[in-house]
């Protein structure tokens, strides 16, 4: 009588299990990466939307945003929590940082986009350091009746690394 000694798994079966685990892991990492990118995109969109709405609410009665800048907007609570100060020195605040690490600036402008002059009754939001797909998503948003918003400037010719 021949004894059969087949109590364990074969090496081929174990390699198959490892391959399945590897495929599932790669899928999970890709899914997580896409989810984080969507989260960051939504953070930027929400921040811009809240900033526009807050400026509209705060300056609606005045019908003039002369002198509005990032520091004044931050001090007045116009800039939401989605955007963080770019440095610890809030007295010298010139921009805030969005979720992709780029900058956001709020500036008073004339209707033709000049940042100086006595008739700066409009404002612009300047966003730099966005990936191309996020810039496109923001550019295609319907901003509705955004009051005195002249423009949302995206990247100003700069791209974030790798995009």
Where in the sequence are the language-model features?
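N-terminal single-pass transmembrane signal-anchor helix
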Residues: 1-47
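Weak global preference for isoleucine
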Residues: 2, 12, 20-21, 29, ...
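Membrane-proximal N-terminal amphipathic helix
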Residues: 33-68, 72
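Periplasmic/extracellular, small/polar-rich flexible segments of pilin-like filament-forming proteins
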Residues: 61-163
